[in-house]
């Protein structure tokens, strides 16, 4: 990705997430509840729940909030029942966009997502229109200057699928979704702490945007991320600083 800094884009995305901390607890509670409902209440045997609980702890969510969310998911406590929904579409320059939601009213959610697309220069598409452009995987990002050879050896030994060194010197470790936590833990034991990590939908090809197009694309992403029912927004767009 000549002319673009993968590290800068990751940091920019993380900054956007940090700026929206007011919504973080709500989204995490939803994810914990759904993960527990689908896979059981023990994080040791439910990788999705373990990841959600780890995220919640990283955000300093009180343990009693986490426990209540798990119990709502397992049915031990009453609570709202959320459904998963995914919407796909196109942003500026044809950039692929995928929106993952947890909702108690799909009619409301699809209307809100469609409105955000159309109001901000995007176009909501049909199911499957862009999903094939993304790979479901774990991603751990290490800062430029990290020892490439040592990290690669430790990552592959821990079960990572791939290790990629970017043009800006940052290093990405790619894992299977269900191996993300195991690889992350193994690397931390080997003294490699990622600056950023998540289970994500990684674009297979990137759409480079700059200037006004990048600004318009950012506005679309912000509009989608601000919706109450939206959990994650993935895009193939890579924007200049």
UniProtKB/Swiss-Prot annotation:
One of its GO terms (molecular function) is DNA binding. GO terms for biological process: regulation of DNA-templated transcription. Residues 1-21 are annotated as: Disordered. The keyword DNA-binding applies. Keywords: Cytoplasm, DNA-binding, Transcription, Transcription regulation. PANTHER family: TRANSCRIPTIONAL REGULATORY PROTEIN YEBC-RELATED (PTHR12532:SF6), TRANSLATIONAL ACTIVATOR OF CYTOCHROME C OXIDASE 1 (PTHR12532). Belongs to the TACO1 family. This is Probable transcriptional regulatory protein AZOSEA20720.
């Amino acid at each position: 990705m000549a002319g673009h800094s993968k590290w800068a884009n990751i940091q920019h995305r993380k900054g956007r997430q940090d700026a929206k901390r007011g919504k973080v607890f709500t989204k995490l509670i939803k994810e914990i509840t759904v993960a527990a409902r689908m896979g059981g209440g023990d994080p040791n045997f439910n990788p999705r729940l373990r990841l959600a609980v780890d995220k919640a702890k990283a955000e300093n969510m009180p343990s009693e909030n986490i426990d209540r969310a798990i119990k709502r998911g397992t049915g031990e406590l009453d609570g709202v029942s959320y459904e998963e929904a995914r919407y796909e579409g196109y942003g500026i320059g044809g950039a692929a966009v995928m929106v993952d939601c947890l909702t108690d009213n799909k009619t409301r959610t699809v209307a809100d997502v469609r409105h955000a697309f159309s109001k901000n220069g995007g176009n909501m598409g049909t199911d499957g229109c862009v999903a094939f452009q993304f790979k479901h995987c774990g991603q751990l990002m290490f800062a430029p200057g990290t020892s490439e050879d040592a990290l690669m050896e430790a990552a592959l030994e821990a079960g990572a699928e791939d290790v990629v060194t970017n043009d800006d010197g940052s290093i990405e470790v790619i894992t299977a979704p269900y191996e993300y936590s195991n690889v992350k833990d193994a690397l931390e034991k080997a003294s490699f702490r990622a600056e950023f990590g998540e289970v994500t939908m990684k674009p297979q090809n990137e759409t480079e945007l700059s200037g006004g197009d990048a600004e318009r694309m950012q506005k679309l992403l912000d509009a989608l991320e601000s919706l109450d029912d939206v959990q994650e927004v993935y895009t193939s767009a890579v924007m200049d600083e």
